């Protein structure tokens, strides 16, 4: 084995450069959140959009609202995560100072012509509401309302702000919309506001607690689903262990007895079972380049999921705009050597020679899938003039991360994988000529095993899927990452158990095509998750329109595919260890 000081040095240098490049972007905090008396407090206007379509958002001033008179304000620097999530912070123009009350005052006037009235009427008909920020605390308000007959429409013109402070920090913000004014063409509408400062006992670190919903996320159903999944894991692990231990013990006893027979008795005997394919079970999988790239990508997705959940459990990422996405991008880039190591080593063990091509496919498989979907949805967002349209500069930044961070780190991982664990070390010799696969019952066919393999893993997570979907597609903040970690562990255990059982029955039917079968049977969980997303869309939401529908099903396809690749890699890795173990313990001539 050759030493790799150069590769290790490159890995260390690349990782250090990556940290310096991306780590500052993982925090959305531009300020210290401390103020002096009379110091300026900025009210940012974010986006406006229909209530039932959370992702269909537009710039606040795309509606004909007017801007306050205050003009001097420092520029806001958005993070990568904010840019990708469509955050569009614009200065409101309102003059607000720390601990300085503002009596009701007019800050601007709307000259309401027919075009502006129609824009407001459309927004009110579609239940538009807007989001604002003060000191990174979100505030929501509705644009207006219609009368019972739907003939007259009214605009809320008075923003009554109550801001709580504890010491020199802002800990609470409340908005009350008042001043309902009927929308009549060719009239002038005065927009006004007031600010009331109140001393609060809320601690700064607890100021986001009001936005959480413990009654929803810690409902008895949530606890029961976790308990139910945990009991299923215990039952499944016990069942698998009992079946395999008893069955394998009988198999080993039968094979040991066969070893004691002479050649004539062995020829007359009825040989069957998984031992018969010992010369083919470690044969390289079909399409090894794609297979190894999928395994490497799945291992990386698992590493990203594990690290991000741990970080979210330690840090309250939900308190900063875009921090979850920024952290995920940073961790994905940083874990690129994991992809290269597992994908490159597997490809080398399977005798692959085009390792550079495999490295490129492994590095860009997931980014290409995500960027391709985002590119398609971006066209629709541009057509709708939605804030979700990704700016060109952000696209360039993402491409730079892919080519100058992910690709070099993936190369380092591939080189390490090929040199450290790329040599075949199978317990059985691979025959030169493949063994014919005998006919078997229909339910032992790989296609049937693949379709059925994802049912139990999906059953262990589908309740958690509801809470995750609701937090993303509705107006809930997901914060119970301990639940998510437990569900991830349960999913891994169930997936490995199911794929081991499926692989055992496949090998016992003397079918040695277990690599793709183990991967796809675990990955089929994604099919059930995507099918569940259809149920959630039609029965749990009131989404409508081309943009929101495309956004929903496009990114749900990305999420389901990534989950499937991760489960497939987990299933294959567990099954590979199982197959190696059982053939190591069998005496082969």
UniProtKB/Swiss-Prot annotation:
The chain crosses the membrane at residues 224-244, 294-314, 328-348, 360-380, 389-409, 449-469, 482-502, 519-539, 551-571. It is a multi-pass membrane protein. Its main location: membrane. InterPro entries: EMP70 (IPR004240). Keywords: Glycoprotein, Membrane, Signal, Transmembrane, Transmembrane helix. The keyword Transferase does not apply. GO terms for biological process: protein localization to membrane. Belongs to the nonaspanin (TM9SF) (TC 9.A.2) family. This is Transmembrane 9 superfamily member 3.
